[in-house]
Amino acid sequence: MQRDELKALREDVVARAREAFARMDEVAEFNTRKVLDAMRACRISDAHFGVSAGYAYSDLGREKLDELYARVFDAERALVRTQFVSGTHALATVLFGILRPGDQLVSITGAPYDTMQTVIGWAHESVGSLKEFGVDYDELPMQDGHVDMDGIDRIVTARTKLALVQRSRGYSEREPLSIEDIRVVSARIKAANPNCIVFVDNCYGEFVDTVEPTELPDVDIMAGSLIKNPGGGLAPTG
């Protein structure tokens, strides 16, 4: 390919991608402003960045970090810790914190990724899994990369305690769920069982839109990972 052809190809690709990049810039600017506004509202100061030795029951910086995340993600409360070694660890904490023996967990977005299957324990035996704990499990296969909306009515019943919605594609080839997708799916779950807890796995989904799942009326709880979007590649764990 000659230089002029390469130049023309580059200009064509840049022109076609310009709208998408402009949208990304808008989202980044919106979320930057939202975080800064939240930091001002929480009155974050230098004192909150001080190192704590851990010899106390309270930690001013830790408490403010929780408050800040709750405000940014429009949640009632937030728990942000580097002691969570990964997103899977955070997700497992939610599941084990809510579910009890005899409860039913349903995955609305098909089979979760491998590390979550180890936590659940139904695809293969694993020590300390939800299955071993006595939690029942079922999953709704995706249809051509999309959530089976009619299937939600069948799989979510009166005994379903928690419905898991995985936003990212994980290791599959399906498209990730948009905020509008999550809005529609969570509303359908609540229509099938108003008492079912809607839990969104938001790993890789933080700050990619101007609305977070916890801002939606039918999403009850969400978990993500500091080592992905929020940490910007800087957080060692979380």
Annotate each predicted stretch with a short phrase.
Residues 28-32:
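Acidic, PIN/NYN-like endoribonuclease modules and their adjacent C-terminal/linker elements
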Residues 79-80, 138:
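Structural signal for short hydrophobic segments within the conserved structured cores
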